[in-house]
Amino acid sequence: MGDARRYLNLPSPFPMKRGGELHGAHVAYETWGTLNAARDNAVLVLTGLSPSAHMTSCDEDPSPGWWQDMAGPGKAIDTDRWFAICVNSLGSDKGSTCPASLDPATGEPYRLSFPELALEDVANAAHAVVASLGITQLACLIGCSMGGMSALAYMLLHPGSVRAHISVDTAPQAQPFAIAIRSLQREAIRLDRHWNEGVYDDANYPDIGMSIARKLGVITYRSAMEWNGRFARIRLDPEQREDEPFGREFQVESYLEGHARRFVRTFDPNCYLYLSRASDWFDIAEYGHGSVHDGLKRICIEQAMVIGVSTDILFPLQQQEQIAEGLQAAGARVEFVALDSPQGHDAFLVDIEHYSPAIGGFLNRLAAAPSPHW
């Protein structure tokens, strides 16, 4: 397969919110469609924790992207109409500078010497990409999961840079349940003896810790309703079971194992730790004197769609309502969409049947509306 990624060298030094700075840092991104002469048809997508910038296929890289059925010619994010941009998060190992990158000061990987990462840093790096393309205002900023929090930071830190926003299954701050789950995921990685304080290699790799972390994640990304419908209490065939005490016996256990096996070596453990903690730290209330509502009221956009799903236990529907109410109080025209999907937090990735009409409909209405001058 080809590689459609492009790279932007960030300003050097690049200051980080929680202290420290990066030198010679860069971020990876991909684009689809054509930027029009007025440069007012750009749509930026910010991702969850683990995806790359490869949102959908293109001529340079025809492999399916992580949102393949949502973006492309004639799809909800119609690249015949919109100039779509997807940025790989700063701190991710999918092409951007991250803990696995070489520190130019030492020639060795940063590992745990990488500065503390905040989602505000992710937002600032994404804004640098947009600015480098000569775009002063995005037609729409779409943020999914962790990327939704990064999107809120983007709009707060760069007022007037976004016309409309689509918030997808995200939150204005992490609730205790989400923090607790991510804490267990990080603990599983750190307690793997091969993690070795962040110093590992392919021969000595924290496979077990990453596997447990992924399994915990998958459990929170879906819903009990889906588990019951798909697996019930169905057991594995005898030849599929593990021949050891307390080994895998139920189909749901095998499903989790398969997910973990496919993920373990595809994402750097230290990057996982950094982005996971950044998700815990983000709190829009910091921008509203301790109030989530007042923090959201500082965001100045024309209109927004806030989408949530009733079975999401990681970012509950009530948090989507908070975002909708706050943006509306700030003066935006807000559409709140509560979807009834059994697939939980991951519904935006798999329940395209419900998400696509909502997102595509909003973008169609945005395209038909006159663009104001801020």
List PLM regions with ranges.
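Catalytic-loop region of hydrolases
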Residues: 1-45, 59
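Short alpha-helix in the alpha/beta-hydrolase fold that links the catalytic acid
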Residues: 287-293, 303, 316-327
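Catalytic active-site module of serine/aspartate enzymes centered on a nucleophile-bearing elbow/loop
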Residues: 322-324, 328-374
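Alpha/beta-hydrolase-fold enzymes
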Residues: 161, 167-262
